[in-house]
Amino acid sequence: MTTMTRRELLKASATTGLVLGAPAILSAQSKAPINIGTLCPLTGAGGSYGPDMQRSVVAVVERINKAGGIHGRPVQLFHEDDQTNAEAGVRAARKLIDVNKVVAIVSTWASAVTLAVKPLCVETQVFLIGVSGADAVTQGDHKGYVARTQPNTKLQGSMYAKFVVSKKEWKRVAYLALQTPYARSFGDAFNGIVRAAGATITDDLIYEDKKPSYRSEVTRILATNPDLIMLEGYTPDSVVMAKDIYKAGFKGAILAPSFAVNAKFIEGAGPDVAEGIWNMDRAPLFDSPAYKEFTAAVPRNDTSPYAPQAWDQISIVALALAAGKGEASGTVIKDNLRAVANPPGTVVYSFAEGAKLLGEGKKINYEGASGSCDFDLVGDILSAPFAVQQVRKGKSELVTVINP
């Protein structure tokens, strides 16, 4: 696997965006480029995922430009690191919007970042699409300029709960979550379904970030005698929390999001602490032609859903622009989003397939590497299967897939 440093990733910006597709641009494209920005977390808590997300976008744009671009115009990429930090994300978004004049920003990760840059995008009519889960991302009057490929927290909470209630030995469940924009809405959805199924929520605790120890929180949770701890945090805090839970002698089960329980988590927590921890996230469409093309183009060491979602985000944005009449703007993207991503229409798995049919005046339905990308009226995806994994001998292994 070829890896890129943060410096190398950030150098893949304005000039690189053109160079990547240079042969196609020189031979088939003479019009002004369409500027699109990425705002991935190359550093910070999401730094495990941002580089692969960015590589995915670059790979798709290479293909778009080799196929002749969008209405004969090449796509030019501009990359910024949001640092998994809202303030840094706003500064980066302002640069993309004001200096680079992008029509879309793709692949934001943390909900706090997406929520911070959302008003800027709505005000300037720049289309924003990311993988953030907080319900607030698509709430309010965003005028259609915001969408996501990651399930919202209500859908996530319900899918986690569906798995939990299938395990009859988990009768007593404690909810333990980092203070984030999604913690409360996820917990409400999760706890409600678990209770309705007859299990007991023994405690519901939201904890602060960046504490050197969570012994007091662990003591409180374990005093309720749970069979399962639903741990909803990011990787850094989850490492500290899992260590403290292990040291306290907890013999029950832990379930967490896969974006927290990743290779860095296993390395940081250690194999003994990590062993047996369950984790879940959206399942890619493993058998899809789009997923197969994605895996060949973006080799990586994990199966997290964010890189394939980034692949789909740039594909959908490009197809929405192709469905327009030549104008490239955030408004064209939001007006054509569902026309290219939702049924009815011929199922397509790539920009080249879709652009060809659109050019023939036909309807299309993009199915991507991450699965179906069917959006409701507020920009949420309608449904998604979830992969259930468990850490076994130092690696997260797929156990089953839970369907809606």
Label every PLM stretch briefly.
Residues 2-12, 16, 21-22, 27-404:
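Extracytosolic ligand-binding ectodomains
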